[in-house]
Swiss-Prot record:
Gene for this chain: ZNF763
Subcellular location: Nucleus
Role description: May be involved in transcriptional regulation.
Name the UniProt record assigns to this protein: Zinc finger protein 763
Chain ranges of zinc fingers (C2H2-type): 144-166, 172-194, 200-222, 228-250, 256-278, 284-306, 312-334, 340-362
Organism the protein comes from: Homo sapiens (Human)
Length: 394
């Protein structure tokens, strides 16, 4: 198995995210960080008699003490036997910033590599064979510029990964299921999922993931928790990435542009879906029935029709569903929620399909035509024997 890099297992919370964790999640977090601090101790780090949560909430002090500690020729019981040496303070360009950095640490140390900080506040303890053990990167230049959207990167691999978001290139393929990824770390995470060896197992469905952050995110698919709220329309989201994409619907930002037709999109996933309208690609094929799918998620839900798995269960009536989307649709039958509203008459609907059908009454659009009499309607009668006589004309 490939060595685990720090960025693949980093536990990294912002203050806002930390405030959203409940007691059980913080307890799990402390257990993970305890193991991390033990690893730090094994390479010479000294801790005062303070609790773990306090240590993590004060990373700047730990950051400084780590620099000033005696880390002389640390040799890990590792794969390469590299020697780590301490750098004098005068060789460190250390400047404190006002904003507290976040901490990143590695569960599985490979030659003792440890990272503390975020992208703008990052120090690595590296074995450079007798040279720099600490490399401070706060004010390092970012020579790699991405124009779509405008972002700068310090390292070329990060820049290449960002480029693949726009080009759709996914050079790393999983041998188990064929799913492709833009980075090698994606493959490692996928292999953990297939092997079931991840240290964090979901108590609802048994799915294993390799790091705490992904575990907490996955848990929300079962609990329905939505901690990210849009300030403009008060809509809530389970994931920060979904929240950011939604915000672009208000700002009008569309950073992903198709090079073939010039159409732009709010999200990378929408852009990738659009690209397949040009290529016709359906890379996910069911081994049991041969049906192909454009999306891995659709493929996984389809597989459940063969296995009979229904992981999403309604707490009110115990009815189970194959997909979370179907579960949400069913949930509205209990709550009476109607989130889809017509912009013209303000009438609300439970499902988006009902809204689209209603909107045709305003536009006079009638895409269905009777084969026998030629009469046009805005929608077909799906529950009548006459359904077979209607065909879609648009």
């Amino acid at each position: 198995m490939d060595p685990v890099a720090c960025e693949d297992v980093a536990v990294n919370f912002t203050q806002e995210e930390w405030a959203l964790l409940d007691i059980s999640q913080r307890k799990l977090y402390r257990e993970v960080m305890l193991e991390t601090f033990r690893n730090l101790t094994s390479i010479g780090k000294k801790w005062k008699d303070q609790n773990i949560e306090y240590e993590y909430q004060n990373p700047r002090r730990n950051f400084r003490s780590l620099i000033e500690g005696n880390v002389n020729e640390i040799k890990e019981d590792s794969h390469c036997g590299e020697t780590f040496t301490q750098v004098p303070d005068d060789r460190l360009n250390f400047q404190e910033k006002k904003a507290s950095p976040e901490a990143k640490s590695c569960d599985n140390f490979v030659c003792g590599e440890v990272g503390i900080g975020n992208s703008s506040f990052n120090m690595n303890i590296r074995g450079d064979i007798g040279h720099k053990a600490y490399e401070y990167q706060d004010y390092a230049p970012k020579p790699y510029k991405c124009q779509q959207p405008k972002k700068a990167f310090r390292y070329h691999p990060s820049f290449r990964t960002q480029e693949r978001n726009h080009t759709g290139e996914k050079p790393y393929a999983c041998k188990e299921c064929g799913k492709t990824f833009i980075s090698h770390s994606g493959i490692r995470r996928r292999m953990v999922m297939h092997s079931g060896d991840g240290p964090y197992k979901c108590k609802f469905c048994g799915k294993a993931v390799h790091c705490l952050r992904l575990y907490l995110i996955h848990e929300r698919t079962h609990t329905g928790e939505k901690p990210y709220e849009c300030k403009q329309c008060v809509k809530s989201f389970s994931y920060s990435a979904t929240h950011r994409i939604h915000e672009r619907t208000h700002t009008g930002e569309k950073p992903y542009e198709c090079q073939q037709c010039g159409k732009a999109f709010h999200s990378s996933s929408s852009f990738q879906a659009h690209k397949r309208t040009h290529t016709g690609g359906k890379p996910y094929e069911c081994k049991q029935c041969g049906k192909s799918f454009s999306w891995c998620h659709s493929f996984q839900i389809h597989e459940r029709t063969h296995t009979g798995e229904k992981p999403c269960e309604c707490s009110k009536c115990n009815k189970a569903f194959r997909s979370y989307r179907s579960y949400l649709r069913h949930k509205r039958s209990h709550t009476g929620e109607k989130p889809y509203q017509c912009k013209e008459c303000r009438k609300a609907f439970t499902y988006p399909s009902s809204l689209r059908r209603h909107e045709r009454t305003h536009s006079a659009k009638k895409p269905y035509e009777c084969k026998q009499c030629g009469k046009a309607l805005s929608y077909k009668f799906s529950n009548t024997p006459k359904n077979a006589l209607w065909r879609k004309t648009l």
